[in-house]
């Protein structure tokens, strides 16, 4: 629209990756680069020169490492925790990133969740499937709708799916009653310091899909929170504040909370763009 590149500039911040962190004499240091972000689809950022500094010199570190939660993720939270002890605000709190698995954390609010089972025991999982007939199976450390399976009643692939997901009974997974409301999409509610942003992103699955995730090809519509969305947010919010989880995304399908995203929640840009 004739806007200059300078006018489209959104922010200037310092940027670092996991590989940029080191510990020297008991203090976490980082190789930092200035990062300028532009509202431009083709050239959306520019990087500056590197410089070394203690993380304790920063006011805030926004930690946005995607799952899976592996040992490198674990080590990164420990390195960042040194800066946290020295007064830097880490978003989200390091201990809570380690403690709050995005699938399991939701089970702390059973009044908000659909019928589900967490197990690696094939017998228990098959019994859950027999009880509910139409079930979603998913790993505990995935993201973006990866490795999620819907298994209906009498599906001949049940055994091989469970063998694959559980690695023959060695890996714990989640089984969740299929929610027909997913046909109308799932809802991403963004939580800031335990309070829900008043608008959410309804993510609609592609034709023939069970997943509304944008990473799985879903499309998004920004809309006001429903009464049920607000109620779920009110149940979860105090615990988020207590745990220092300042920036979180709730996934809601119909009337049910399905996940609490604490590592790298998305959809804020889509909501901001639609509602300013």
Describe every region a protein language model picked out.
Residues 1-12:
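Single conserved hydrophobic/aromatic residue that forms the stacking wall/gate
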Residues 65-68, 140-142, 265:
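Short glycine-rich anion-binding loops that position phosphate/pyrophosphate groups of nucleotides
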Residues 207-208, 224-276:
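ATP-dependent carboxylate activation and anion-phosphoryl transfer catalytic cores
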């Amino acid at each position: 629209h004739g806007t200059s590149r300078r006018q489209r500039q959104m922010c200037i911040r310092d940027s670092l990756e996991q590989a940029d962190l080191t510990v020297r004499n008991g203090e976490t240091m980082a190789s930092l680069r200035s990062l300028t972000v532009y509202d431009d689809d083709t050239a959306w950022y520019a990087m500056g020169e590197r410089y070394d500094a203690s993380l304790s010199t920063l006011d805030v570190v926004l930690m946005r490492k995607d799952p899976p939660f592996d040992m490198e993720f674990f080590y990164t939270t420990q390195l960042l925790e040194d800066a946290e002890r020295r007064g830097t605000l880490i978003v989200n709190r390091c201990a809570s990133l380690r403690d709050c698995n995005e699938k399991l954390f939701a089970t702390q609010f059973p009044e908000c969740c659909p019928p589900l089972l967490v197990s690696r025991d094939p017998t228990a999982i098959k019994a859950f499937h027999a009880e509910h007939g139409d079930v979603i199976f998913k790993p505990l450390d995935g993201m973006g709708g990866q490795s999620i399976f819907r298994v209906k009643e009498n599906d001949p692939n049940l055994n091989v799916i469970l063998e694959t997901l559980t690695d023959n009974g060695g890996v714990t997974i989640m089984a969740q009653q299929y929610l027909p409301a997913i046909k109308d999409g799932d809802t991403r509610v963004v939580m800031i310091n335990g309070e829900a942003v008043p608008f959410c992103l309804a993510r609609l699955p592609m034709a023939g899909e069970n997943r509304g995730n944008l990473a799985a090809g879903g499309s998004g519509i920004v809309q006001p929170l429903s009464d049920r969305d607000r109620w779920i947010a009110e149940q979860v919010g105090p615990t988020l504040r207590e745990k220092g989880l300042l920036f979180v995304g709730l996934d809601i399908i119909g009337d049910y909370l399905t996940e609490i995203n604490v590592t790298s929640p998305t959809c804020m840009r889509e909501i901001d763009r639609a509602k300013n």
